[in-house]
Amino acid sequence: SLTLQAQEESLKSIWVMNIENEINKAFILLKKNNIQSAKLDSEILMSSVLKKNRKFIILNSSQNLKKKSISTFRDLINKRSKGKPIAYLTGKKEFWKNEFNVNEDVLVPRPDTELIVEQVLEFYKNKSKLSILDIGVGSGCILLSVILEKKNFQGVGIDINKKSLDMCKKNTLKLKLGDKVKFFKSDVDNFNYGKYDLIVSNPPYINSLKLKYLESDIIKFEPRIALDGGLDGMSEIRKVVDKSSELIKKNGKLFLEIGFDQKYKAKKILKDKGFYINKVVKDLAKNDRCIISTKI
C-alpha cells in the first residue's frame, strides 16, 4: 500500500548519510555527554571536515557525504564527546580579528584575553613606535594581534616550551609578521634581553590545588604548565612582575592578566616592585581580569 511505501521512504531518509542526518546524530551524542554547545560544535566540526563555512553546511544540509568524510567527522565527534576542546579538534581558534593555529601545546586563546589587546590599542592609539615583550607567548595571540594593528611596533616573545614557540612561529608566518617579532625559548627568570616600552603577559594563575576542579576539557587537554600558578596561584605572577621591573623602561607599562580573585594580591606585588596601578579592567562576566600598571 501507499502508506507502507511512504513509511519505507521516510525510514530510508533517516539513514541517508547526508550532512543534516550526521549532524543530528552528532548532536544527540554530544548532548548525552553534557556538551553545552552540541549543535554549534557539530556544525563547526562538519565545516572543518568539508572545508566549508557553517553557512554552506546549513544551506546544503541534504548533500550526501562520502564515507571518508563521515568517518573523519564521527571520529572528531567521539573526541569532542570526551571533552576535547573544539579548537584542538579543528586546529584553529578565532581571536581578536584573526584565526590562530592551536594545538595541545598551547592554551586555547580566550575571549577574556582579548581585553589585553583592546586595552593596549586604546592606551597606545597615538603611538607610532613601541617595543613589546610578551612573557609566556603561547600561540602568540596577544603579541601578534597587537602588532597586526600597529605596523611599526616591534615584539619579542618568550616561552619555556619549545613546542609552544613552534606554534607561535607558525602563526607569525601565517600572519606575515616575521620581520616584526623575535622569539626566545626561555623561562622568565633567566631572560635578560633588551629593554621594553610595554610588557604583556597572561601567566598561569590557577591555584595548583584548584586545578582538579576546572572543567574536564580544560584540565584533561590543555597544557598544565600554562594553567598552574603554584599553591597560591600567584607564583608565576610574582616572577613576571619581578622580571618586568628589570626589563621595562622608566614609565613603561605592564598589562597583566589575573584570576578573578587576585586583584588585591597582584596590586601589592606590583606596588612592592615600584609599579603605579593605572587601572583594573573587568571581563565580560564582570570579573577583574587585567591590571594595567606603570613602572615609576
PLM-predicted stretches and their roles:
Residues 45, 83, 113, 142, ...:
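Residue-level signal for inorganic ion chemistry
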Residues 231-294:
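Conserved Class I SAM-dependent methyltransferase catalytic core
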Residues 1-16:
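N-terminal amphipathic/basic-hydrophobic helices that include classical n-h-c signal peptides
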Residues 114-213:
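Conserved SAM/SAH cofactor-binding pocket of Class I
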Residues 48-123:
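Conserved AdoMet
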Residues 30, 124, 172, 244, ...:
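Conserved hydrophobic residues forming the short capping helix/wall of the S-adenosyl-L-methionine
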